[in-house]
Structures are given as C-alpha cells and as structure tokens.
C-alpha cells in the first residue's frame, strides 16, 4: 500500500525516523495500519486494570466474550487458560473481568462464556455481584441471539455448591440464550475437569466462529493485569517465619496472631488489598490419630500425583484432613455400610449439617471401620492453600509480609481440634521455620488512585488486616484524603487488634475518624452495622463527597448486615426508596467505590 507523505514540519519525527517508519509500513494493508496505530496508542497510554474499560463488541461480531468472575484466583486462572487456548487456534476472544464488564451490552453478545466461582452462601464472587443483580432484575434484556457456556468452580464442603454458576447458567437460558455446552461444576480439585471442559468448548467455538488473525484484546480489567513473579501457587516461595505474636488478651475467647514472614531477597511484591496464599502441613498428631483409628500402620504406600509415598507423609503433606464434606461422609457411609451414617445419605440437609459439625477424625471415631490405605486417600480431597488478607504495605515493611490470623480452635467431646493452616502458623512453625507462600493478587480491593479521595473502612475481627495495609500505604504516600475506620470485636480490653497503632494514627491525624463496636462489653450487643446507622448523616456526607467504601470480614453475617445498614443510611439520608438505594449501591460497586473482601 502506498501512503501519501505527510508534511514533515508538522510531525515530531526527524526525516530519518519518518523514512524508517514509511519503509516499515509500505506494504501494510489498511487493517494492519489501523492495528499498528492502536498498538502504539496502547503503548503510549497504558491502563491499569482498575481504570480499563472493556471493549464493547460490534453488533453482529462473532468474537467471543469471555467473562472471568473470580474470588480467590482459580476462576481467573481457568479463564486465562481458555483465552490462551482460543488464541492458539486463531479465534478472536476478549477476556474481561466481571467487575469491568459493561453488562448492559450483553444483548449484543453472540458468543458468551462465563467462568465463575461461588462465595459465602451461594453468592457470586464480589466482582460479579453487579452483573448477577442486573441479570436477575427487570432490566435484563432478552438474549435470543446469544449462545453461552458456563464453567462453575466451588467447594463441596459448602451447602450451596457452585450456586453462582447455576444461577448464571439458568438465568442466561431463561432470558433466551442458547447453551453451547451443559454447565460443568468443578470441586476444589478442578484442574483435570477444567482442562477437559476447555478442550470441548474450544471445539464448539471453532465450529461457531470463523478463524481469523486475532486482534489483541483491549485491556479489560484485572484479569489482564500482568503480575510477573517466579513464585506461584504451583511453585511457592520458601520464606521464613520471623514473628508469631498473640495480639488478643489472655482472657479473650479468640486466639489471634500477628504473623510476620520474611521474604528475603526473593523480589516477591504485593499491594495493599492482596492476599497471601499459605501452603501448610497437617498436624502429625492428627495424622497419627487417623491412621490408628483405621488400624493402619502408616507406612503403606499410596499413589500421589503419580508417585508412591508412605501413607503418613501423604496425609501430612497432600490431603485435606480438617474440613469434612457431605461427599466424604456419603462415600464413607457407602464404603463401610455404617448403620449410623447411611440414613443421613438420603437427607441432604442432615448430611450437610453432620459434615459441617463433625471433623473427619471424629467421623472415623464415632463410626469405626477398617479401610485400607488406598480407600482412605480415595475418600479425601487434596490439600489446598489457605488465603489470608495481607496486613502490611511494602512501602513500610519492605521485604516482609504481615498477616492477622485467627486461630481456629474448638473441642469435640473433650478432644481439641484446630484449623489446618491457622494452627500450622500458630503452633507448628518454629522461629525462622519455613513457610511456603505466594501472592494472590486482588485487583478488586484497591485504594483509590487519587490520594485526595476519602476512604471508609469497615471491618470486624481479623477483617482489620487489609485496613492496616491501607493506612500504612496512605501514610507512605502522604495521601491527603480522609480516612475513617469502623471496627468491631467482642471486648475492648481483650480484642482491640493493633490498638496502639490505631491510636497513634488518630493522634497523628492520619486516621480522621474511628468508631468502635464492642459486642460483649454491655448488655445490649453493638456491632459495626449499628455504628454505621448511628453515624448515618456523616457517613452520607462522606459518600456524597466521593468516599470509597471498603468492607472486610465474614461474608455470611457481618458483610450482609453491613450492606443492609448502608442501604438504610442511603434511604434515610439520600432521600431514596429501597430499590433506588440498591441501584445506587450497585453503581458505587461498578465505579469501584464499594469494594468488599469477604470470606
């Protein structure tokens, strides 16, 4: 193609640079020139995931829109792998974070793939809440021209297994969409199932769309942010524990630890809002108990990932022993023909309740039977890392990462039980002992890019962790925006986590306001949501002034109660009805002014 020479006097190029540019592009087609133009514009104007806007598909386009709705990173990894598979066969795909997806364009989609996880009691992941609400609202459009597929990730230890995926799948079909494939629901060991599904959906999509030279996707949110690190979930950093300090009082009902991990010269980087993945080993005493309950020796060889290991080593390093599931109970009952457990199999609610209340070791104790080693490991699920909200900013702590860990401890008929990862960190790692870790980036829980923007932080218990990171970062940035903390726990004297630090931030003026809710210090229980209502007028003024709202804590109770309180504040002081308030809060969520890190 021949292009007309531009007037060189009007260009920021010297004649030699212009000549090289013309020589390089002389045989380009108009489409290729347009692509190069967009490429260099993208180089000049890089956008972060938080600010990027998803590209709307052209009407009639057969490009594939791939939505990632992730809570802990697993759905994102599956979506990214599918994107790579599609690009490898020259299919045009646009991968977009559910939080960045312009959902009002959904009726324009021809080919839509959703990869989603589930959180809490069957809710969609945080980044997909707005999309979920829209699809279930009266505003949802007909999707008669849309073909779709859903891959759902979940955990069978929870009652509402893969519920978000079921919701999306059923609603997309109800709105007129055509299923490309039946929905697939995957448990925590999802990798093999995901690989099989990816191969199937790629074949289906190849038959539905022409093969072209793919256009590189416009950055479409957090799924496309590049976090380069040699350390991953599959290849974690071997770091060392440097501090393990109990930060609740001696009379507290809670055992909360401040944990510091030395990253050394690894170069591992994180941002406030990220989580730390921790691989742990099961308690050797628990392993011994399970082996003895089944009349095994512990040296029996079992297959793990294609290798033969002694049973005790396999149980300590490779299998989940502290979380029971309905599936494990059902399979154990069927294998052993247990007179007590078999009647539960036909009652889903009772089965789920029993699994939630009875650890694996106690199930074996209460319903004893003899299993061989292979049958035992066949019952169990693979050990997976635990994620903890990071409680520090590298701007302050540099080569360290801090955690706020609530140690899970309870008794079953006089026998002490504990959480796998929390007790590992609190009880079984020596000073400078090894901890295998990785960063799980969370681009859906980020400080405002403008340091002048006020922030409202709402947390209870260990939900204080990311806000400690936030305030450290705001201090390091010398951010002028106001900071308001709402924090709740049972007792002021026993459970005020990081009390000295927060009081110092108040004294220095960095923490503009702090409201504390102590639920057990008086006859009437007071929670953070009560403090939100109490401060409603001022809270609304902050929101009106552009404040970003952050919530961290329990998904099933605290986060729901906080959201209800926020809606009531918006209704009372914003002059809206409940439906309008709900829409307003959804708009804040879409604008990333309402972000939650809940578990």
From Swiss-Prot:
Pathway linked to the protein: Sulfur metabolism; hydrogen sulfide biosynthesis; hydrogen sulfide from sulfite (NADPH route): step 1/1
Binding site for FMN: 70-75, 117-120, 153-162
Domain FAD-binding FR-type as annotated: residue spans: 234-448
Keywords: Amino-acid biosynthesis, Cysteine biosynthesis, Electron transport, FAD, Flavoprotein, FMN, NADP, Oxidoreductase, Transport
Catalytic activity: hydrogen sulfide + 3 NADP(+) + 3 H2O = sulfite + 3 NADPH + 4 H(+)
Gene Ontology terms: biological process: cysteine biosynthetic process; hydrogen sulfide biosynthetic process; sulfate assimilation
Cofactor needs: FAD; FMN
Binding site for FAD: 322, 356, 386-389, 404-406, 410, 419-422, 599
Top-level lineage group: Bacteria
Cofactor comment: Binds 1 FAD per subunit.
Signal peptide: none
Residues annotated as binding NADP(+): 519-520, 525-529, 561
Domain Flavodoxin-like positions: 64-202
GO CC annotation: cytosol
Enzyme Commission number: 1.8.1.2
UniProt-listed InterPro entries: CysJ, CysJ-like_FAD-binding, CysJ_Proteobact, FAD-bd_FR_type, Flavdoxin-like, Flavodoxin/NO_synth, Flavoprot_Pyr_Nucl_cyt_Rdtase, Flavoprotein-like_sf
Pfam families noted in UniProt: FAD_binding_1, Flavodoxin_1, NAD_binding_1
Enzyme class at the top of the EC tree: oxidoreductase
NCBIfam families according to UniProt: cysJ, PRK10953.1
Protein's job: Component of the sulfite reductase complex that catalyzes the 6-electron reduction of sulfite to sulfide. This is one of several activities required for the biosynthesis of L-cysteine from sulfate. The flavoprotein component catalyzes the electron flow from NADPH -> FAD -> FMN to the hemoprotein component.
Subunit: Alpha(8)-beta(8). The alpha component is a flavoprotein, the beta component is a hemoprotein.
HAMAP family, A to Z: CysJ (MF_01541)
Family stated for the protein in its record: Belongs to the NADPH-dependent sulphite reductase flavoprotein subunit CysJ family.
Protein name per Swiss-Prot or TrEMBL: Sulfite reductase [NADPH] flavoprotein alpha-component
């Amino acid at each position: 193609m021949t292009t007309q020479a531009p007037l060189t006097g009007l260009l920021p190029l010297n004649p030699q640079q212009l000549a090289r540019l013309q020589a390089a592009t002389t045989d380009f087609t108009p489409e290729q020139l347009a692509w190069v133009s967009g490429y260099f514009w993208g180089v000049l104007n890089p956008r972060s995931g938080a600010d990027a806007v998803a590209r709307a598909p052209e009407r009639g386009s057969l490009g594939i829109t791939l939505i990632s709705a992730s809570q802990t990173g697993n759905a994102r990894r599956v979506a990214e792998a599918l994107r790579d598979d599609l690009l490898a066969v020259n299919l045009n795909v646009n991968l977009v974070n559910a939080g960045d997806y312009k959902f009002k364009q959904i009726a324009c989609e021809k080919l839509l793939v959703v990869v989603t996880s589930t959180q809490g009691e069957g809710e969609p992941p945080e980044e997909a809440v707005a999309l979920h609400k829209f699809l279930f609202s009266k505003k949802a459009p007909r999707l008669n021209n849309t073909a779709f597929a859903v891959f759902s990730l979940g955990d069978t230890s929870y009652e509402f297994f893969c519920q978000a995926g079921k919701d999306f799948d059923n609603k997309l079909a109800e709105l007129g969409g055509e299923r490309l494939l039946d929905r697939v629901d995957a448990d925590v060991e999802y990798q093999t199932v995901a690989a099989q599904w990816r191969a199937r959906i790629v074949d289906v999509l190849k038959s539905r769309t022409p093969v072209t030279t793919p256009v590189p996707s416009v950055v479409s949110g957090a799924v496309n942010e590049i976090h380069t690190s040699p350390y991953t979930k599959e290849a974690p950093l071997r770091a060392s524990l440097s501090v393990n300090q109990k930060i609740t009082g001696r009379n507290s009902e809670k055992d909360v630890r401040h944990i510091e991990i030395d990253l050394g010269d690894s170069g591992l980087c994180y941002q406030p809002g990220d989580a730390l993945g921790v691989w742990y080993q099961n308690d050797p005493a628990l392993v011994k108990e399970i082996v003895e309950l089944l009349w095994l020796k512990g040296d029996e060889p079992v297959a793990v990932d294609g290798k033969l290991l002694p049973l005790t080593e396999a149980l300590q390093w490779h299998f989940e022993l502290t979380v029971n599931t309905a599936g494990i109970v059902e399979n154990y009952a069927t294998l052993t023909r247990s007179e007590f457990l078999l009647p539960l199999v036909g009652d889903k609610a009772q089965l789920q309740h029993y699994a939630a209340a009875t650890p694996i070791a106690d199930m074996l104790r209460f319903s004893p039977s003899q299993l061989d080693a292979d049958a035992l490991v066949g019952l169990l699920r693979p050990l997976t890392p635990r994620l903890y909200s990071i409680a520090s900013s590298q701007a302050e702590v540099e080569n360290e990462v801090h955690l706020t860990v609530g140690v899970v401890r309870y008794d079953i008929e006089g026998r002490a039980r504990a959480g796998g990862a929390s007790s590992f960190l609190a009880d079984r790692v020596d000073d400078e002992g090894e901890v295998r870790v990785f960063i799980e980036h969370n681009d859906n829980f980020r400080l405002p890019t403008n340091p002048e923007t006020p922030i409202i932080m709402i947390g209870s218990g260990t939900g204080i962790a990311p806000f400690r990171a936030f305030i450290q970062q705001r201090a390091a940035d010398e951010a002028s925006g106001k900071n308001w903390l709402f924090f709740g726990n049972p007792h002021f004297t026993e459970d005020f986590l990081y009390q000295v630090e927060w009081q110092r931030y108040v004294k220095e003026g960095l923490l503009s306001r702090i409201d504390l809710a102590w639920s057990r210090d008086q006859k009437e229980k007071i929670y953070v949501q009560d403090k939100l209502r109490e401060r409603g007028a001022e809270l609304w003024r902050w929101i009106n002034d552009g404040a970003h709202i952050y919530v961290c804590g329990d998904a099933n109770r605290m986060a729901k109660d906080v959201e209800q309180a926020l809606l009531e504040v918006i209704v009372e002081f914003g002059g809206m009805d409940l439906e309008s308030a709900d829409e307003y809060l959804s708009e804040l969520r879409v604008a990333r002014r309402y972000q939650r890190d809940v578990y």
